[in-house]
């Protein structure tokens, strides 16, 4: 009888321990993501409809590319997406997002890339971008972090 009581107490204790372990287990966030102070330097990119037809950009169909964003640290892979865009008019913002979804504008590895095809379709003006930066368990929105300025002709060089 004493043996059965000890066995029952042992089983109850073991069950309580298992239930305690299961109840205390919860999903732990993987890694980290730090974006405080994240910025582009310079924080804008000039994009042109008409480029010099003899330039390397024209002959090799090279896109317009920003400098890589600085100040982002986190567990790899760290991913970047266009979160939103503000423009002078709603239709310009919609066109920008459409070109992004078509892959003619991209945010890759902290670089903003505008193809020549996209640059010819965008209307003149300023496009202020907000980016989503994320990894497995973390994300941040970098609001109004970069500006693309679209004009007809290349800026004159000194």
Regions found by a protein language model. Name each.
Residues 1-8, 16-42:
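Bacterial Sec-dependent N-terminal signal peptides
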């Amino acid at each position: 009888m004493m043996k059965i009581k000890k066995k029952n107490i042992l089983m109850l204790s073991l069950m309580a321990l298992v239930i305690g372990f299961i109840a205390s287990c919860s999903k732990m966030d993987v890694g980290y993501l730090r974006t405080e102070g994240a910025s582009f330097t310079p924080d804008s990119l000039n994009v042109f409809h008409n480029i010099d037809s003899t330039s390397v950009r024209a002959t090799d169909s090279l896109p317009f590319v920003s400098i890589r964003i600085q100040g982002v640290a986190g567990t790899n892979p760290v991913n970047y997406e266009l979160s939103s865009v503000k423009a002078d008019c709603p239709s310009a913002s919609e066109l920008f997002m459409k070109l992004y979804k078509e892959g003619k504008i991209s945010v890759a590895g902290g670089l903003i890339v505008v193809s020549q095809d996209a640059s010819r379709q965008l209307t003149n003006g300023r496009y202020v971008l907000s980016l989503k930066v994320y990894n497995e368990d973390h994300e941040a929105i970098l609001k109004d972090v970069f500006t693309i300025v679209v004009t007809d002709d290349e800026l004159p060089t000194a």
